[in-house]
């Protein structure tokens, strides 16, 4: 209903306003082209050093652009709007297309987390160790794994934070299992005794920065204050990373190795599932978190978004075509008498076409740059509201996101340029000049 009312309003109100304005004029005035205001100067004419350097045709173009202000703003906003939509659509597609690779190849290097039951016998522990030392496992690392809770997000939901605590002696091995990287400062992060490293999405939900303190709840519903020593790039889930020394400082108790980060020799989807089944069947294994399930969640979301983004891109392209085509046709139709006069004065066909089409080209170029600014703002807004609380989109924008919209508008302008040129080449000058009388 809201969409229908907005569509009706945007279609009917402009038509009503324009018709009402025109009908106030006398019929005799409506039959004649509207003359420019006598002695009027445009803004550029007042900038003397710049105005003197313009050629005659450029001065004519600038005067015509500012003479038809309504059409100028329509072209600017039309091109800028289509560029902004196309930029945002391509930007979102770029932001989500490589999420799995960024999360599970560039950042997370382990294939699964195996959590152990507490207080198990040494015989059961040996069975687990035997499987860990098998040829199917490339490497593994003993860590403390704990799930903390924090209320965050727009709906004030309870967020689960996966906490990984590494032994102090294993500091140099952390990079083999997870790459801790500050995306904004392009800096590699290291664990310290003075705080924990939090995932970027959680930091954004809580508006945290380095040096702040976060209060979380542990499994016993006890409040624990944790100082933020760094913010790491992370696209799936909420994480806290710390070493054993800081864990004991924050929690008041030493950490206990109760889990293993495991990297498999063959990390194929089927092999990960088979190994996860082997681990979960061991009596002293509490649970297994495998990356396959997380990859599937991201893939499902990306596929759904890709279809919606495809529609957005298609609509933005159609908008650009419709806006430029209609405005060009209106421009030619309303100024047919002026163009016939120019042609009678001895201008060649290409010169006549550029006489009027140069305005569209200049305005489209300005509209492209305005659209880039609007598109960046729209992209950042969409990146912040579309993903759920546990997922972050890559906010960076690739070069292709800038090039494709500009190339597309350029292609549309070239096609329409040929259309305008052919139309003006067939123009009957005498008929157009006599039509006013």
Where on the chain are the PLM-derived regions?
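Short cytosolic juxtamembrane segments of multi-pass membrane proteins
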Residues: 24-42, 425-437
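Hydrophobic secondary-structure segments that place a key small or acidic residue at a functional site
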Residues: 186-246
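Small-residue transmembrane helix packing/gating motifs
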Residues: 107-108, 190, 232-273, 292
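Interfacial "coupling" helices/loops that link adjacent transmembrane helices in transporter permeases
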Residues: 1, 310, 322-362
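Short helix-loop junctions at transmembrane helix boundaries
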Residues: 1, 20-21, 368-411, 417-431
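A short beta-strand structural signal in non-transmembrane regions
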Residues: 111-117, 202-203, 229-231, 254-282, ...
